[in-house]
């Protein structure tokens, strides 16, 4: 008689919700949204951390850089 080895069940992977709502536009003027994707030091967070798609990450990077040039966002956060 064969003995059956019980294997642990694999957990199903659920898609995590994207941090950007479908109606929200990635725009350099939307400073509140852009601040969510910048670290405390002022660096742009990676796609892996923010769970953005590649297309969204490119648009976010361009928007953050434009906002920095227009002095809407700081290049470096020096607040201690």
Curated annotation (Swiss-Prot):
Residue spans of biased composition, Basic residues class: 1-19
Gene Ontology terms: cellular component: chloroplast; mitochondrial small ribosomal subunit
GO aspect biological process, one term: translation
Classification via Gene3D superfamilies: Ribosomal protein S18
Keywords: Chloroplast, Plastid, Ribonucleoprotein, Ribosomal protein, RNA-binding, rRNA-binding
Signal sequence extent: none
GO molecular function list: small ribosomal subunit rRNA binding; structural constituent of ribosome
InterPro entries in alphabetical order: Ribosomal_bS18, Ribosomal_bS18_CS, Ribosomal_bS18_sf
Region Disordered, residue ranges: 1-24
A Pfam family assignment: Ribosomal_S18
Subcellular location: Plastid, Chloroplast
SUPFAM superfamilies (UniProt xref): Ribosomal protein S18
HAMAP family for the chain: Ribosomal_bS18 (MF_00270)
Subunit relationships: Part of the 30S ribosomal subunit.
Family: Belongs to the bacterial ribosomal protein bS18 family.
Protein name (record): Small ribosomal subunit protein bS18c
